[in-house]
Amino acid sequence: MKQLRKFKTLTAICTIALASTNFANADEAWQRAAGVGEFAPATQDWAAIEAAAREEGTVTIYSVSSRIAKLVDSFQERYGIEIVGYDIASDLQLEKLRREHNAGVHTVDVLFNSESSILLNEALPAKLVWNFIPESVSDELTESEKSPLLIQRHSSRIVYYNTMLNPNGAPINSLWDMTREEWSGRTLLPSPLEDSLSANFIQTILANPEDMAAAYQREFGEPLSYSEAVIEAVENIATIDKPNASIEWLYRFLQNEPVFQGSTTKIFKNVGDIAQENPPIGITTFSKLRKNKKGVYAAGPIYDLDPIFGVTYPTALMIADMAPNPNAAKLLIRYMMEEGFSPWNEPGDYSARESVEAEQVKEFDLPSFEDLKLWPVDAEEIYYSKFSFLALYLELS
């Protein structure tokens, strides 16, 4: 897929262009007081940060994970600070933050967010969010996990199957199997038109056409031929040069009537439900593995899926610009990187901290993160090809 010309969205441009001198001065004063960006101190005085955080008394977080609720009691018990958490999808968080910021409304302190394409190409350049790295965890993170944003964990969208009703192993071994007639109406996933991470999953497949072509030949024993519908669709979209295997896969996949469901948990349970005869497969979050329940749900990842096991994306923590409680924000971020990681210490969620990941691999009997056959989301490619992808998706649907 031809990369679209680089541009900033109109909203992001307006965020910068319409900012008044008074607001800019106020923002710089906040940055200085909050100790972020160029005003970050050389060393972090955690006694002072904690004292100031207790004085602030509350911290508001927009969280991509509902598990943030599990930290409320323990954080308040330890620090006397109330967490006000909102479970909001990553893309909606950023839209909400942008609108509030433009309106001069500043209520959120921390964002817990997985939408790297918008974060890195809009929010961070526009200084809507600020990176903060607690010194206590810095040495356990790679440079890419510290900059441009702090990564708390690595998540993935993968394919699950019902292990109870497939005792001999996964019923498919290739992404191309999803295009076979026997799987018509039997593949579940969130709609890429409604779920940004589902769209990112598909876009990442589209960004790897050579691997998809090789996988087709391994699966069917012959070179791939393009459908007329794919050829016509490509001719109608100026940003796409020519047909490729990934586009052909998407066309055949959509023609095979996948079932779109809004809840990733519901998808997992519908796949793993043992009280059925002909279970579907499902594309959902790796960490849903924790939802297995003896005698009720039995679902497992298809580790050997060709050409990839899944698509991985980082989940980051950051301070919102003009956060009213910046010290409590710093304290919460450190907490979520340390003992407050516990709600996400589940199979399928890999901690960015090296020591914690090593413990997870041993405890959960899982492959290490680096040994998984995953394609990482390319934030720049996802961002600049988004409109091209949507045009293609609608043409092929």
Per-region residue spans from a language model:
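Periplasmic-binding protein-like
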Residues: 139-142, 153-157, 249-253, 296-321
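Extracytoplasmic ligand-binding site segments that recognize negatively charged/polar headgroups
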Residues: 62-73, 84-98, 106-269
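A ligand-binding cleft/hinge motif common to bilobed small-molecule-binding domains
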Residues: 117-122, 272, 277-300
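Mature extracytoplasmic/periplasmic domains
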Residues: 310-378
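Conserved C-terminal helix/tail region of periplasmic/extracytoplasmic solute-binding proteins
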Residues: 27-42, 370-397
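Short, polar/charged alpha-helical segment
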Residues: 44-54, 64-82, 290
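N-terminal low-complexity, Pro/Thr/Ser-rich intrinsically disordered segments
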Residues: 25-52, 230-234
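Gram-negative bacterial Sec-dependent N-terminal signal peptides
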Residues: 1-23
